[in-house]
Amino acid sequence: MFYKIAQKFMFQMDPELAHNFAIGSLKFTGNSPLNCFYAQNIKPAPVTMMGLTFPNPVGLAAGMDKEGECIDAFHAMGFGHIEVGTVTPRPQPGNEQPRCFRLKPAKAIINRMGFNNKGVDNLVANLKAVKSNAMVGVNIGKNKDTPVEQGKEDYLICMDKVYPYAAYIAVNISSPNTPGLRSLQYGDLLDDLLGSLKQKQKELAEQHGKYVPIALKIAPDLSSEEIEKIADALIRSEFDAAIATNTTLTRDGVSGLLNANEAGGLSGKPLNSLSTMVIKQLADCLKGQLPIIGVGGINSAEDALDKLDAGAEMVQIYSGFIYQGPKLIKDIVEAYRIK
């Protein structure tokens, strides 16, 4: 009920303004009695994945809490894990505004944010301040002005800094809004990146006395052959997991709608079937050697179960969460428990 009222108010605002207002409110209330407006008691439905035990299979996808300011608030809502970021080594403003658009009739969003964030040091300070025992994944990326050929250095810098505070680290090479980034999904660039990250993980595990798993986040706009090659590279490098998928450049299901022709990545309901198809293809190629976190267009418990049936072990929500509110977390966990 409270969410429906809040949503009505925020949907009158510009999407980015509404996002910033929501983040500010959650940051302010996360550890106060005011969190009663959104806190939920969700009975545990544990999932063991990447050597970690999560309280339930529903996570918050990266992009919502870029700076890790609201981890305690999202934990109070009942998320099994919270993925913060994408974070880059240095602060950057992202692309010019407006850069985020609602497509309400399709329950979709188009964004071309461009990894706007205050830099990895700011994120680390926020991670240190977390009071809850939330499972936090950190999604890392490269700065826009770092050449793609040197991109791996940015990932290594971020990994080094967030390692002690992360439950797992997600490597984002699939945002469509950083020029050239998706080229890291192919061939020698991918092999070199995965190999370097695994080597760094080994060094950091010795240094900190704990093993923090690393997952690769991939795009939905891949051919069967490309998915097969990525799966092969993940297996060869002994990566810990895959996250499928990021936003799409396709516009299926939204043609003719206001804002449908805006540049950027499309998320929300129209992405659902495409991302589930990619999960299925990826799972077939991985043959159980790596677990998958399924994300993209989940708008109901049924959508989440479809992704689990396709081969994912956990799911993440973002656009569906904006349109449905915290109730979606509870719905998915309950459906998972019955299943």
Curated annotation (Swiss-Prot):
**Per its Swiss-Prot or TrEMBL entry, what cofactor is needed?**
FMN
User: What reaction gets catalysed by this protein?
Assistant: (S)-dihydroorotate + a quinone = orotate + a quinol
Residues binding substrate are 66, 111-115, 172, 177, 246-247
Pathway annotation from the record: Pyrimidine metabolism; UMP biosynthesis via de novo pathway; orotate from (S)-dihydroorotate (quinone route): step 1/1
**Signal peptide annotation:** none
| EC annotation from Swiss-Prot or TrEMBL | 1.3.5.2
For this chain's record, the cofactor binding note is: Binds 1 FMN per subunit.
Give GO terms for biological process: 'de novo' pyrimidine nucleobase biosynthetic process; 'de novo' UMP biosynthetic process
UniProt keyword list: Cell membrane, Flavoprotein, FMN, Membrane, Oxidoreductase, Pyrimidine biosynthesis
Primary localization class, coarse: membrane
Entry GO terms, CC: cytoplasm; plasma membrane
Q: Where is the active site?
A: 175
Superkingdom of this protein's organism: Bacteria
Annotated coiled-coil segments of the chain: none
In what way does this protein cross or attach to the membrane? Peripheral membrane protein
Tell me the GO molecular function terms. Answer: dihydroorotate dehydrogenase (quinone) activity
Enzyme class comes to oxidoreductase
The record's subcellular locations are: Cell membrane
**Entry-linked InterPro entries:** Aldolase_TIM, DHO_dehydrogenase, Dihydroorotate_DH_1_2, Dihydroorotate_DH_2, Dihydroorotate_DH_cat, Dihydroorotate_DH_CS
What residues bind FMN, as annotated?
Answer: 62-66, 86, 139, 172, 217, 245, 268, 297, 318-319
Query: Subunit details for this protein?
Result: Monomer.
Biological role: Catalyzes the conversion of dihydroorotate to orotate with quinone as electron acceptor.
Q: Which family does it belong to?
A: Belongs to the dihydroorotate dehydrogenase family. Type 2 subfamily.
HAMAP family registered for this protein in UniProt: DHO_dh_type2
What is this protein called in UniProt?
Dihydroorotate dehydrogenase (quinone)
- The source organism is Shewanella pealeana (strain ATCC 700345 / ANG-SQ1)
Gene symbol here is: pyrD
